Amino acid sequence: MDNKVLTQNKKSWDIMADNWFGTTALPAYGCLIPTEDELKLFPSLIGTKVLDIGCGSGHSLKWCGDNGASELWGIDISTRQIENAESYLTKSGYESKLIDTPMEEMGQLPKNYFDVIYSIYALGWTVDLPKTIHNIAASIKQGGILIFSWDHPLMHCVIAQENKLLLEGCNYLTDDFVSFELRGNPVKIQSRKMSTWINTLAEAGFKIEKLVEETSEKVLEKECEFSTNYYAPSRAKKMPLSFIVKASKL
């Protein structure tokens, strides 16, 4: 596990946390992709214990509470995100159990406990995917549901240039780390093949129930100009910007 990457990412997220308050939260899964209202991937949450990996400002946990979850748990590497989530959930009338920890070090969570574990655009920040997925497998009940969304693996391999999408970015065949600036703050993530995600889940005892690689119908139906922006509608018309996985613990 690369502790230097964790330290840098934590520092940057503590700086950025307030600027991301309330963004990319359930029922949304990400940018220009179908929502939970459309996909209906979650089971009934009434009376369930849920865990949010990378809980951010707590808006997805509030959505779970609004839909009947009985226990709201969350972890995040950013101390500031945890502070924001605690404040937001308390003001919203919900008790929560939030832990300031990297997802690679969530071993203190109860075992075989959660009915649903989910991560909305956060799981890809892990610097050790096998360890993180095994941590999740240890905390979720048999038959429990894991749902997560993240950038589609092709996103780092494609660049937009001169009205074309070109396969000239990262090498898809290698799970390399990528350094960049997010809102002016240095961060580092690992680019992973789709097979890396699927095989890691299988090796940890998960069964894939559904893999979503879609663009929102509203985006597909609307005319748009070509753009070089990372999350551009013109790109979303040609390829999925994100993917969503629903898996169950065997």
Predicted regions and their residues:
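Conserved class I S-adenosyl-L-methionine
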Residues: 1-46, 59, 63, 146-176
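Class I SAM-dependent methyltransferase SAM/SAH-binding core
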Residues: 51-53, 57-105
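A short acidic, Gly/Pro-enriched loop at the edge of an enzyme's catalytic core
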Residues: 107-117
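A short SAM/SAH-binding and catalytic strip from SAM-dependent methyltransferases
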Residues: 115-130
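A short glycine-rich, Lys/Arg-flanked "PGG" loop and its adjoining helix->strand segment in the class I
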Residues: 130-145
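Short alpha-helix
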Residues: 188-211
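Core SAM-dependent methyltransferase catalytic element
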Residues: 204-206, 227-250
